A protein has these predicted regions:
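Short Fe-S-cluster ligation motifs
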Residues: 256-272, 289-309
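Flavin-dependent oxidoreductases
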Residues: 4-94, 98-109, 118, 124-127, ...
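Active-site catalytic microenvironments for nucleophilic, acid-base chemistry
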Residues: 36, 40, 183-187, 278-282
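C-terminal catalytic lobe of FAD-dependent flavoproteins
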Residues: 78, 87-88, 99-227, 234-247, ...
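Short, surface-exposed acidic
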Residues: 45-46, 127-131, 192, 285-292
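Iron-sulfur (Fe-S) cluster-binding segments and ferredoxin-like electron-carrier domains
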Residues: 104, 235-246, 269-287
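Conserved positions in beta-strands of structured domains
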Residues: 2-5, 133
Length: 309
């Protein structure tokens, strides 16, 4: 998105790289960019600082090292480095908390890794760091007043901020969504749709079935018998479901987030080619168009020899 401006028709005019949208309401949930969009329409300025948090993810063999989340004492920048078992059996350690200037600054650093190792061992001993399978970083949107900003902007009717969402933002997300929906309903004077379905069917997990049920599933749909991701035992059937459901996956990370394909010990080293073939076939696109997580993260950047990819 490039700009947001008031529309002569009322509402807002949003210009993107590809097109222009006219809308009566904008919900500004742009994370570390929320201040930039807010400041395009309001005289009361908002400032957000990207706060980087780095993590380690350990192999599933380490998940039982602790039985519950272990926190250190909270500090100025958050709750400190924690050690927690995940619901899928891994061990997650982090985050750090470092203010940065770059709104895309999700690179990991040697300094961050050393900080995680040092601080985590204050609360948990003998952490098997040799079992780390990946490290990553994310950015929290720190608002100067250290507050969640969830409201219709006073001098920009119809522009709704959901900004400055730090910890416990994940826990708060369902309530934030309901509050934002209520504000939108009031602005547009909407009436409840009695036919609206509030729930959606999740992606079938064959691992939760009995052997008899799994065999019957594979008999009806052989795609569930073709394992694509061996680390997490994710089948082609699950990947197809993730692609073809409403708001389905269109990227490699989209599939990973919905199915865990690529989240295991080899970090997609084995299953990437097959997953790309499935995306190519199902979305009817070329493999050169497939991205890891949107524009600028293309999986294939060129050819190293003649012939088909």
């Amino acid at each position: 998105m490039k700009t947001i401006e008031r529309s002569v028709k009322g509402g807002y005019r949003i210009s993107t790289q590809d097109t222009v949208y006219e809308t009566k309401v904008v919900v500004n949930a742009a994370g570390v960019y929320a201040d930039e969009f807010h400041n395009m329409v309001s005289e009361k300025k908002l400032h957000i600082t990207p706060r980087k948090g780095e993590y380690f993810l350990l192999d599933k063999t380490t998940g039982a090292h602790v039985s519950h989340t272990v926190f250190t004492l909270p500090g100025k920048y958050g709750k400190g480095v924690l050690v927690t078992p995940t619901v899928h059996g891994n061990l997650l350690i982090g985050p750090t908390a470092t203010d940065v200037e770059q709104k895309e600054g999700t690179d990991t650093t040697m300094q961050g890794m050393e900080e995680i190792c040092k601080k985590a061992q204050h609360s948990v001993k003998e952490i098997p760091f040799r079992q780390v399978i990946t490290g990553f970083a994310g950015l929290r949107a720190h608002e100067d007043g250290h507050e969640f900003v969830i409201q219709e902007v006073e001098d920009a009717p119809g522009f709704i901020d959901c900004a400055g969402i730090e910890s416990p933002g994940l826990t708060s997300a369902p309530a934030i969504g309901r509050l934002a929906a209520e504000i939108v309903r009031n602005v547009l004077e909407l009436k409840e749709n009695p036919a609206f379905c509030k729930t959606r069917k999740g992606i079938l997990n064959p691992a939760e079935l009995t052997a008899k049920e799994r065999n019957e599933l594979i008999r009806k749909n052989p795609a569930y018998g073709r394992i694509v991701c061996r680390c997490e035992m994710i089948s082609e059937g699950e990947i197809l479901d993730s692609i073809h459901r409403p708001l389905g996956a269109t990227t490699m990370d989209g599939i990973k987030r919905r199915t865990r394909a690529g989240m295991g010990r080899c970090q997609a080293g084995f299953c990437t080619p097959k997953t790309m073939e499935i995306l190519e076939r199902e979305l009817k696109i070329r493999q050169e168009e497939i991205t890891k997580n949107g524009a600028g993260s293309e999986m294939i950047v060129g050819r190293n020899k003649d012939g088909k990819i």
